[in-house]
From Swiss-Prot:
Entry's EC annotation: 3.1.1.-
Organism: Solanum tuberosum
Signal peptide annotation: 1-23
UniProt motif (DGA/G) ranges: 216-218
Keywords recorded for this protein, A-Z: Glycoprotein, Hydrolase, Lipid degradation, Lipid metabolism, Plant defense, Signal, Storage protein, Vacuole
InterPro entries: Acyl_Trfase/lysoPLipase, PNPLA_dom
Name of the featured protein: Patatin-03
Family: Belongs to the patatin family.
Glycosylation sites: N115, N203
Gene Ontology BP annotations: defense response; lipid catabolic process
Record's GO cellular component terms: vacuole
A molecular function (GO) term: monoacylglycerol lipase activity
Known function: Probable lipolytic acyl hydrolase (LAH), an activity which is thought to be involved in the response of tubers to pathogens.
Length: 387
């Protein structure tokens, strides 16, 4: 572990020290990353509503939207759905959903998406038909290239056995990735055992048919897509003319907000070595995915925290995560009204909690600080463009 950490830190330090200096302090690359977690997407929904509200107040603009402030918005599974909601344009070329619309969306559609009566005894728990229907209604024919800012939505192709990352910046090289947002959102949410895999086809630059056979993005990038989102931001900084002064991304000029959907309490549904000593394949299968996702999410946060701290840029990274979910709130598919109300409470209470044991700043205070940085950076860009 120590060797891995040292190598990772060394790589990022080399990147940072050899990268060009930003022309001005206000020129930052801003990234929003949203975890997967099914109905638990209500938790980041609460956080996003608070952040967007702060931006509207600071800029005295009720029409301000998150897509106006972030260069890259990435998500996996339910996080991919939220990414699409806040970046897909409406008829006025503004995001079709404000952050305040996210939680009502879950309350209205969650019980139908996670309706166990639609599943089969042998097969996925849910048939996915309502999910696909509502995605088509909300997102229409909109494709990746129309997103109002750069996006990074992951999925996994079970035929090619490779991850598939949908971004605007990849379209010049891979035009077949310019898929409908409805197809992408279903694919990134199609968790094995919960929803059927998704098949659809697009066209290559030669007009040939290109087929996708996709499942949940968490299979490709784990539940926390922060590292994926950062890599997309790095590529944009290298290729986008708007970032000509920062061809090599300096982490001191990267602003990263990563939103989780909650993890179990340390003592909730854990197991001892004695208890599991005689477990077989079936018993392990029931818990191994949860363990793997929790560990991967923790390590992603650990690596990012280490890098930002060692580069003296710890204030540029904020991970908002509830680590003490219990009972029904731990379930990704409990869309009962009672549980959704509990998830709202989790999100609202999270805002009042300290960021960490070593940092007494509350998440609410940290998000206000982030909002100020986002607002100032947007104003800087606007002023620069006017000259």
């Amino acid at each position: 572990m120590a060797t891995t950490k040292s190598v990772l830190v060394l790589i990022f330090m080399i990147l940072a020290t050899t990268s060009s200096t930003f022309a001005t302090l206000g020129e930052m690359v801003t990234v929003l990353s949203i975890d997967g977690g099914g109905i638990k997407g209500i938790i980041p929904g609460i956080i996003l509503e608070f952040l967007e509200g702060q931006l509207q107040k600071m800029d005295n603009n009720a029409d301000a939207r998150l897509a106006d402030y972030f260069d890259v918005i990435g998500g996996t599974s339910t996080g991919g759905l939220l990414t699409a909601m806040i970046t897909t344009p409406n008829e006025n070329n503004r995001p079709f959903a404000a952050a305040k619309d996210i939680v009502p969306f879950y309350f209205q559609h969650g019980p139908h998406i996670f309706n166990s009566s639609t599943g089969q005894f042998f097969g996925p728990k849910y048939d996915g038909k309502y999910l696909m229907q509502v995605l088509q209604e909300k997102l229409g024919e909109t494709r990746v290239h129309q997103a109002l800012t750069e996006v990074a939505i992951s999925s996994f192709d079970i035929k090619t056995n490779k991850p598939v990352i949908f971004t605007k910046s990849n379209l010049a090289r891979s035009p077949e990735l310019d898929a409908k947002m409805s197809d992408i959102c279903y694919s990134t949410a199609a968790a094995p055992t919960y929803f059927p895999p998704h098949y659809f086809a697009t066209n290559t630059s030669n007009g040939d048919k290109y087929e996708f056979n996709l499942v949940d993005g968490a299979v490709a990038t784990v539940a926390d897509p922060a590292l994926l989102s950062v890599s997309v931001a790095t590529r944009r900084a290298e290729e986008d003319p708007a970032f000509a002064s920062i061809r090599s991304l300096n982490y001191k000029q990267l602003l990263l907000l990563s939103l989780g959907t909650g993890t179990n309490s340390e003592f909730d549904k854990t197991h001892t070595a004695q208890e599991t000593a005689k477990w077989g394949a079936l018993q392990w299968m029931l818990v191994i995915q949860q363990m793997t996702e929790a560990a991967s999410s923790y390590m992603t946060d650990y690596y990012l925290s280490t890098v930002f701290q060692d580069l003296h840029s710890q204030n540029n990274y904020l991970r908002v995560q509830e680590n003490a979910l219990t009972g029904t709130t731990t379930k990704a598919d409990d869309a009962s009204e009672a549980n959704m109300e509990l998830l709202v409470q989790v999100g609202e209470n999270l805002l009042k909690k300290p960021v960490s044991k070593d940092n007494p700043e509350t998440y609410e205070e940290a998000l206000k600080r982030f909002a100020k940085l986002l607002s100032d950076r947007k104003k800087f860009r606007a002023n620069k463009a006017s000259y």
